[in-house]
Amino acid sequence: MGRQGNLEELWCLRMPEIITPIITPFTKDNRIDKEKLKIHAENLIRKGIDKLFVNGTTGLGPSLSPEEKLENLKAVYDVTNKIIFQVGGLNLDDAIRLAKLSKDFDIVGIASYAPYYYPRMSEKHLVKYFKTLCEVSPHPVYLYNYPTATGKDIDAKVAKEIGCFTGVKDTIENIIHTLDYKRLNPNMLVYSGSDMLIATVASTGLDGNVAAGSNYLPEVTVTIKKLAMERKIDEALKLQFLHDEVIEASRIFGSLSSNYVLTKYFQGYDLGYPRPPIFPLDDEEERQLIKKVEGIRAKLVELKILKE
């Protein structure tokens, strides 16, 4: 009984996190709308999001100049210091400069994806890229592993060779791939980048999810985590599957563009525009997207997850 009680206590203490890769709002003339960004950050933190991942894919990070990445950091920092600051890019000098500038901010850490586009980069050079960032960073460094987008898989074995990561965001649907980071790097914080694995991650001993859908359904993602941690698995999965339906609907029209529409629909405020070549949805696409998710919203209201 004593051992069982200790296990139950450890289970309750281990609380995985929901991290939002925060959307970057742009004006019609393609500038960052800092006021909208702050409103969004405030809402997310108020609704229980644990940290904000700034300049990620959902935030259209690859389209941002170094100056804009820093601008995003400053705007979000006005709201919270619970920030992982993504600095990566194709110019290592820019990434180094951003990492060094982050010393002026009391944040959680910096992150970087692997250098993308360039084919057949050697593992040796990828390792050198990340080790260089670790050497100059005043904060803990997180790996952002997104093989589909970057063409490089910095898997658990390579991460162990690099040897300086505090954590990883692994954007891949294969949970075994993500679990391998914890197996080979037991002291590393391991986050899944999949929205569809929130309930699963909360049940596996991993450290949480970096979930794009938490931009527009923070209440849902936080509740899925809570239910899973309370071992109310049936309820957690019921909510997870509703969340998955919204994610699937967003992908029909392009998830990066849909995120702006869905945030306005579910959260009630406007996040402006994405940045081309991520174009905004046209009126008909918006109408079709909302039609696909309005029944889900009604169910979430019925479950008292969302307000009327």
Curated annotation (Swiss-Prot):
Entries under SMART domains matching the protein: DHDPS (SM01130)
Active site (UniProt): 169
InterPro entries: Aldolase_TIM (IPR013785), DapA-like (IPR002220), ED_pathway_aldolase (IPR053415)
Keywords: Carbohydrate metabolism, Lyase, Schiff base
Pathway participation: Carbohydrate acid metabolism; 2-dehydro-3-deoxy-D-gluconate degradation; D-glyceraldehyde 3-phosphate and pyruvate from 2-dehydro-3-deoxy-D-gluconate: step 2/2
GO molecular function ontology, one term from the record: 2-dehydro-3-deoxy-phosphogluconate aldolase activity
Superkingdom, natural source: Archaea
UniProt: substrate binding residues: 57-58, 144-146, 169-171
Reactions catalysed: 2-dehydro-3-deoxy-6-phospho-D-gluconate = D-glyceraldehyde 3-phosphate + pyruvate; 2-dehydro-3-deoxy-6-phospho-D-galactonate = D-glyceraldehyde 3-phosphate + pyruvate
EC category: lyase
EC code(s) of this entry: 4.1.2.55
Site feature location: Proton shuttle: 144
Keyword Hydrolase: no
Subunit record text: Homotetramer; dimer of dimers.
Sequence similarity: Belongs to the DapA family. KDPG aldolase subfamily.
Job description of the protein: Involved in the degradation of glucose and galactose via the Entner-Doudoroff pathway. Catalyzes the reversible cleavage of 2-keto-3-deoxy-6-phosphogluconate (KDPG) and 2-keto-3-deoxygluconate (KDG) forming pyruvate and glyceraldehyde 3-phosphate or glyceraldehyde, respectively. It is also able to catalyze the reversible cleavage of 2-keto-3-deoxy-6-phosphogalactonate (KDPGal) and 2-keto-3-deoxygalactonate (KDGal).
Protein name: 2-dehydro-3-deoxy-phosphogluconate/2-dehydro-3-deoxy-6-phosphogalactonate aldolase
Name of the coding gene: eda
